[in-house]
Amino acid sequence: MKAVRLYEHGDEKVLIWEDIPLPEIKEDQILVKIKAAAINHLDIWIRKGIPGISLPMVIGSDGSGVVTELGRKVDKFSIGDEVIINPLLFCGNCSSCLENKENQCNSMGILGETTNGTNCEFIALNPRNLIRKPKSISFESAASFPLAGQTSFQMLVNRAKLKKTDTVLIWAASSGVGSFGLQIAKLYGCKVIATGGSKDKCEHASKLGADLILNHYIEIPRLEELQD
């Protein structure tokens, strides 16, 4: 199969498009044919070498696809299911996982950083890393939100316990994490103050429903006024 793999860190020229073996699934795994893979800022950090990953590595954390093969112990999915990939790797058995704090798992990892990721034609995954994709969502849209969306949800809902009476400041609201945070906060009925670094980014935050928008390069002093 084809995949994008890193053998060294650097600029875009280090991204190698090549043939690699098709993954063989274990008895508790699922083989997914990738239909869409999104670019996350994490991919840029990994390409540049910031996380210090082991090489070679197939990059990519976010993706969506179709189930093509099932391990003999898998009973929660069927061949042909359209799925969204959860890039967070966790054991499911430690105390953190049992408390639904998978991001604090003792063996926590991320696809495309600690193991081969989604920039390939096929990927072998545990069922806990798959979510059925609603038919109303395209593969491209489904691939765009797992890492950024989960990060925002974890911060606002699981940790901050977001409630309707809250006023939420979303810094850099047009970023991946920021745009999902803005939408999640509005979904919970919160008042949202958003910041952006340009006119276009502020306009994007407005389209997502921000109640008040500040250019964080020139208007941050207004925050003191808002707190009075």
Q: Where would I find each of the regions flagged by the language model?
A:
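Nucleotide donor/acceptor-binding cores
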Residues: 1, 165-167, 191
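Glycine-rich beta-strand-centered segment in the early N-terminal region that forms part
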Residues: 21-38, 50-98, 134-136
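Cytochrome P450 core scaffold surrounding the K-helix E-X-X-R motif
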Residues: 42-47
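NAD(P)H dinucleotide-binding glycine-rich loop of Rossmann-like/cofactor-binding domains
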Residues: 89-172
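Adenosine-nucleotide cofactor-binding segment
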Residues: 170, 186-228
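N-terminal Rossmann NAD(P)H-binding glycine-rich loop of SDR-like oxidoreductase domains
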Residues: 174, 182
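Residues forming the Rossmann-fold NAD(P)(H) cofactor-binding site
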Residues: 179
